[in-house]
């Protein structure tokens, strides 16, 4: 007997096929077209920001986010221990160093351990979190919501504000 346990189950409830067919008919199935523009406009409105940029993958979105956070070679970025490599690769693209943070029972980053790391292994100099042992700047924390479980963003955002970290979600 063969049993298959899916990693995730697609959830299609509306006009997805209609929209995909329409995009194909218009010849826009990648980086442009009306649907991309509409997505960017709706996301900007939802987020209350002037502009957003749709990306072709989560990896490229994370890479652009690290650039926006001014992550430089030699900097550090906190990442969860349980994630796909695509969440860590962009850190290496910037020649930065990932700092792996353990997860809690939700399988997402543990804010208790994040706070303990910031308190015990780091210090703040001129509104910049510094890893005490290495002297390296910690510029950001990448939060990944795993398998439909939501990370405790309220706690993580509080920690990030206190320790001057940018949050990439």
Spans of features found by a protein language model:
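N-terminal "arm"/small-domain region of PLP-dependent enzymes with the aminotransferase-like
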Residues: 1-29
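Active-site phosphate-binding strand-loop segment of PLP-dependent enzymes
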Residues: 106-169
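Short beta->alpha connector loops at strand-helix junctions that form conserved
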Residues: 81, 100-104
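Conserved coil-to-alpha-helix start sites within the AMP-binding
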Residues: 83-88
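Phosphate-binding glycine-rich loop
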Residues: 29-76, 90-94, 100, 123-133
């Amino acid at each position: 007997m063969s049993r298959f346990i899916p990693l995730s189950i697609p959830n299609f409830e509306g006009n997805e096929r209609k929209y995909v067919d329409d995009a194909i008919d218009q010849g826009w199935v990648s980086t442009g077209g009306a649907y991309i523009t509409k997505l960017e406009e709706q996301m900007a409105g939802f987020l209350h920001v002037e502009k957003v940029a749709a990306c072709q993958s989560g990896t490229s979105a994370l890479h652009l986010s690290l650039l926006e956070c001014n992550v430089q070679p030699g900097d550090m970025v906190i990442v969860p221990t349980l994630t796909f490599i695509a969440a860590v690769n962009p850190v290496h693209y910037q020649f930065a160093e990932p700092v792996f943070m353990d997860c809690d029972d939700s399988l997402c980053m543990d804010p208790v351990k994040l706070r303990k790391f910031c308190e015990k292994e780091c210090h703040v100099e001129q509104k910049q979190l510094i890893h005490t042992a290495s002297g390296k700047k910690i510029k950001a924390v990448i939060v990944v919501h795993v398998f439909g479980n939501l990370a405790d963003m309220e706690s993580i955002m509080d920690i990030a504000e206190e320790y001057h970290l940018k949050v990439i979600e």
